[in-house]
Amino acid sequence: MLRRVRYLAPALALLILAGCGESGPTPEEQVRTTVAEFGRATAAKDYTALCDRILAPELIEEVESIGLPCERALRQGLGEVEDPRLTIGTIEIDDDKASAEVRTSAAGEEPSRDTLELVNLDGVWKISSLGS
């Protein structure tokens, strides 16, 4: 009996190690994380995080089209929003593009349903459009 266990032990160890080799989060999990970070940064009024890590360059360019740097433009547009909340719904991924259905609400405002567009830039998902 012990002899059989001795021969099975290396095989079991290999099976256990094979199960430990996870490849990291799926693209859907990565998109969900980016959208959740967007919600947290918006609620915290962390415009630096939004501009530096979460928004795609094309969206930053659009935000800055009013003649202000990204952070100041966001502060001007979002600064008065109180208690913003974001709930993530369905996520769809098509190669290096993704969309996330979200429900947003804030104090004193009607809730709305929007679709955020994301793009994968060098392995990092960033928000390229704030609603459609």
Locations of the language-model features?
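Surface-exposed, charged secondary-structure patches
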Residues: P25-T26, L68-T115, G131-S132
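Short, low-complexity, Pro/Ser/Thr/Gly-rich segments in the mature regions of secreted, periplasmic
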Residues: V119-S132
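Short, well-ordered alpha-helical segments enriched in acidic and aromatic residues
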Residues: T34, A44-E61
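C-terminal motif of bacterial Sec signal peptides marking the signal peptidase cleavage site
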Residues: I16-G19
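Hydrophobic pocket/interface hotspot
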Residues: F38, L50, L118
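Short, aromatic-enriched amphipathic alpha-helices that serve as compact interaction elements
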Residues: P27-K45
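Bacterial N-terminal signal peptides that target proteins for export
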Residues: M1-A9
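Sequence contexts marking disulfide-bonded cysteines in secreted/extracellular proteins
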Residues: G21, L50-D52, P69-A73
